[in-house]
């Protein structure tokens, strides 16, 4: 099916272009969401008459997205999740979780604007791409940790995927003298 795009759609085309797409994509996504019109003579004339309005609306959406991008770009957010000693999460951090974290900070981002190839399944620092507008793309950093203190340590560059790194190593507790007396002969004086 041929459609006229009413806005720029990544990997498809610019506003005003006539492109050929699969019928299901047009019927289920582009047409119901008002992102395209069927390519016929009446709709081409309608598009040309509304072109200035559509371009102004698109420019307004882009400027709003750019304002949010200026505030969000490069920012770091802490996500606290329970994880095993190797750093594997009990569960994962998906696009829905990213939206919740951003909403808690006061940013209204849709789940479809978060681009994660796969859910995050390990603690650490992770870059997440946000597509705020077809022409505005930014990255935020998610600091996935077991606790806020651990997140601070991760932000400083510590690797927290081993037991010693998580809980720390107490050198005094590892001395053999604490467990047995090398001077003793192995017989308890009370028993003798």
UniProtKB/Swiss-Prot annotation:
Domain of life per record: Bacteria
Compositional bias ranges of the Acidic residues kind: 179-192
Keywords carried by this UniProt record: Ribonucleoprotein, Ribosomal protein, RNA-binding, rRNA-binding
Record keyword Transcription present: no
Cellular component terms (Gene Ontology): ribonucleoprotein complex; ribosome
PROSITE patterns associated with the record: RIBOSOMAL_L9
Pfam families, sorted: Ribosomal_L9_C (PF03948), Ribosomal_L9_N (PF01281)
Function: Binds to the 23S rRNA.
Name assigned to this protein: Large ribosomal subunit protein bL9
Species this chain originates from: Rhizobium etli (strain CIAT 652)
